[in-house]
Regions:
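Non-catalytic carbohydrate-binding regions of carbohydrate-active enzymes
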Residues: 1-13
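C-terminal beta-sandwich/jelly-roll accessory domains of carbohydrate-active enzymes
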Residues: 11, 16-17, 29, 36-187
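Glycine-rich, charged/polar anion/phosphate-binding loops
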Residues: 19-21
Length: 187
């Protein structure tokens, strides 16, 4: 992230008992990037403090939390010092941004996980990451690009957002579940 290069050099370790092994926070008093990891077969939930513990200073504004990895997901606006739950999927890392200043992202959505394919002004392209059989209320959530219109699968939608339903049958089990043990065999 070129736009945050100047603050990413200031890092500190987070307490392992709260944030897991090798958890780090980088940034300044207004914007922090927090890295968490999970090297187990089960989803791990970390309780992230949106305050001094992660290096964020109080300025009277709400704290915006946005997950950036393994996908982008808006986690909402919260009070300074409050705690949010961040789930880290098995064998994954998570990158969380918390900030109490105006959003620098060019494109920002809420209501659904997504990836940005292209964020160039005039033609941003976003891949929505919904699960089969699920419905989502997708909203344009600020960012530095003003939208006049948007298309989802070639259909025009209003700039206030849209309901999106993904085709297919809703999953009965988690897609990241441990299926079974592997047996050794001769080759």
């Amino acid at each position: 992230h070129r736009q945050y290069a100047d603050i990413l050099v200031n890092g500190q370790r987070l307490p392992e008992n709260n944030y897991g092994p090798e958890a780090l926070t980088r940034g300044d008093g207004n914007t922090r990037f927090i890295t968490l990891r999970n090297l187990t077969w089960n989803t791990v939930t970390y309780h992230v403090n949106l305050g001094k513990e992660v290096g964020l200073e109080q300025n009277g504004n709400k704290v915006k939390a946005r997950l950036y990895h393994p996908y982008i997901y808006d986690m909402g606006n919260h009070s300074y010092g409050s705690t949010i739950d961040v789930k880290v999927l098995p064998f994954r890392a998570a990158l969380l941004k918390v900030t109490n200043v105006k959003e620098k992202d060019k494109v920002a959505l809420s209501g659904i996980p997504y990836n940005i394919v292209n964020d160039y002004s005039g033609n941003p392209t976003i891949k929505l990451l919904g699960m089969p059989g699920m419905s989502y209320k997708v909203k344009f959530d600020g960012g530095n690009i003003s939208f006049k219109s948007a298309d989802i699968d070639g259909k025009k939608v209003g700039t206030k957002g849209a309901n999106v339903k993904f085709p297919g049958e809703k999953l009965k089990e988690d897609f990241y579940r441990h299926i079974g043990e592997m047996n050794a065999c001769d080759i």
